[in-house]
Amino acid sequence: MSMTDPIADLLVRIKNAAAVGKQTVKAPSSKIKVAIAQVLKDEGYITDLRVTQLENNKSELEIVLKYFEGKPVIATLKRFSRSGLRQYRGKSELPKVMNGLGISIISTSKGIMTDAQARQLGVGGEVLCFVA
């Protein structure tokens, strides 16, 4: 089965697992998914991530979700740029999520990073998603 938007699939898996209180989420792995999960870990939205090698040269990404007082730390997780309509922003047009309380994840020429890191480096790019 082919996926038209693997990033949206990962975000929906995380959102659904957090909504029902699961501890971990498993998804097919790719470099961009691992980079997005690493940004979420660095920003404190998830506890840990692991990449497991499977047969047939495939790998699986396992994300350990984070909860605070029984509620998921990730309250909002929304895909912004999608396969049918890519959303690119310059360094001065990068969106702030909830006036800086959340983050937006940006794919830049220097890698995948948060909006704050992209502003600090003075680069723009494709706005992948919002997290709050």
UniProtKB/Swiss-Prot annotation:
Q: Which GO terms describe its cellular component?
A: ribonucleoprotein complex; ribosome
Has UniProt tagged this entry with the keyword rRNA-binding? Answer: yes
Note the InterPro entries from the entry. Ribosomal_uS8 (IPR000630), Ribosomal_uS8_CS (IPR047863), Ribosomal_uS8_sf (IPR035987)
GO molecular function: any one?
A: structural constituent of ribosome
One Pfam entry for this protein is Ribosomal_S8
The Swiss-Prot or TrEMBL record describes its family as follows: Belongs to the universal ribosomal protein uS8 family.
**NCBIfam families hit by this protein:** PRK00136.1
Q: What is this protein called?
A: Small ribosomal subunit protein uS8
Q: From what organism does this protein derive? A: Stenotrophomonas maltophilia (strain K279a)
